[in-house]
Amino acid sequence: MTETTIFQKIINEEIPCDKLYEDKFCIAFNDIQAQAPVHFLVIPKKPIITLLECIEQDANLLGHLLFVGSKIAKSKNLTNWRTGINTGAESGQTVFHLHIHFLSGRKMNWPPG
């Protein structure tokens, strides 16, 4: 059996979060380990570990996650932000439930690592 992640516990309302948005497909909340003045996550309610596990039927869901993040960013009057998905431990993924980072409020450097 797969370990229940902190994100699944948030989805199940077992632990609180600073929720920004929720619908039947996803939930968005502020990152508790913010790396920028604005740093929120959008996660699917479907338990997908990484992009590697996505299948063709997930394409609309992935687009929805990006759309929701953009909608939240616009509601915060953001005009510049970075969007990122870490896939696997070596990329920096620490919670193994797919999530999209939206960061803003400071100049982003490249390369990011």
Residue ranges, per PLM feature:
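HIT superfamily nucleotide-processing domains
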Residues: M1-G113
